[in-house]
From Swiss-Prot:
PTM-bearing positions, type Phosphoserine: 196
Name by which UniProt lists this protein: Cytochrome b6-f complex iron-sulfur subunit, chloroplastic
Gene3D superfamilies, alphabetized: Rieske [2Fe-2S] iron-sulphur domain, Single helix bin
Enzyme Commission number(s) of this protein: 7.1.1.6
Range of the transit peptide: 1-50
Tissue expression notes: Confined to photosynthetic tissues, with highest levels in flowers. In leaves, mostly localized in mesophyll cells. In stems, confined to the peripheral ring of chlorenchyma and adjoining groups of cells associated with the vascular bundles. In siliques, present in green wall of the fruit and in peduncle but not in the translucide white septum of the seeds.
Reported cofactor(s): [2Fe-2S] cluster
GO cellular component: chloroplast; chloroplast envelope; chloroplast thylakoid; chloroplast thylakoid membrane; cytochrome b6f complex; cytosol; membrane; mitochondrial inner membrane
Superkingdom of the source species: Eukaryota
Keywords: 2Fe-2S, Chloroplast, Disulfide bond, Electron transport, Iron, Iron-sulfur, Membrane, Metal-binding, Mitochondrion, Mitochondrion inner membrane, Phosphoprotein, Plastid, Thylakoid, Transit peptide, Translocase, Transmembrane, Transmembrane helix, Transport
Residues annotated as domain Rieske: 115-211
Length: 229
């Protein structure tokens, strides 16, 4: 009986075929979906690594940020508020007029100005703001003989309406907005302001309080009719 046997070449070919079949069974063809999944996994891994690498003390605290913002805002507003304090009182609604047709002068606290008390704390040459006619800031003037002048000087610049401070060193009213200047009586001596500061009568009533009364007569500084009447 003849036995059948395979030649070495045939056996080698069969082994190669078997290995190729096994390899093809294990090999998975890459698809678009597989690429997307791998990419997402890599991105997620990178983000996770970055987030976990930030120290806890470097993470912004929202409450701290709010507090710092408020402190910064307060710091910025302080200088402006401080500069406005001397003039803020004079932008409140004006008080009612006096019984004699005048308007009581009010100090920075809103109290009536009593002439005798005022002169105790304001010396010769003093010019201090009070609230006058229609609520306008108005300077009370102390004469060299330690008496109150019979006129008050409206502090509103005739250029664009800024409140004009008194400069004692230069003995002038100097407007900080555009450089207008007025002498000690409020007469304009340098533009761009076109006119002198307005006047008001400063009278003293029976109770010793200072009253401002509208000035309708000739302006004694210029000899002209009052432009503000």
């Amino acid at each position: 009986m003849a036995s059948s046997s395979l030649s070495p070449a045939t056996q080698l070919g069969s082994s190669r075929s078997a290995l190729m079949a096994m390899s093809s069974g294990l090999f998975v063809k890459p698809t678009k979906m597989n690429h997307q999944m791998v990419r997402k996994e890599k991105i997620g891994l990178r983000i996770s690594c970055q987030a976990s690498s930030i120290p806890a003390d470097r993470v912004p605290d929202m409450e701290k940020r709010k507090t710092l913002n408020l402190l910064l805002l307060g710091a910025l507003s302080l200088p402006t508020g401080y500069m406005l304090v001397p003039y803020a009182t004079f932008f409140v609604p004006p008080g009612t007029g006096g019984g004699g047709g005048g308007t009581p002068a009010k100090d920075a606290l809103g109290n009536d100005v009593v002439a005798a008390e005022w002169l105790k704390t304001h010396g010769p040459g003093d010019r201090t703001l009070t609230q006058g006619l229609k609520g306008d800031p108005t300077y009370l003037v102390v004469e060299n003989d330690k008496t109150l002048a019979t006129y008050g000087i409206n502090a509103v610049c005739t250029h664009l309406g800024c409140v004009v401070p008194w400069n004692k060193a230069e003995n002038k009213f100097l407007c900080p907005c555009h450089g207008s200047q007025y002498n000690a009586q409020g007469r304009v001596v340098r533009g761009p302001a076109p006119l002198s500061l307005a006047l008001a009568h400063a009278d003293i009533d029976e109770a010793g309080k200072v009253l401002f009364v509208p000035w309708v007569e000739t302006d004694f500084r210029t000899g002209d009719a009052p432009w503000w009447s």
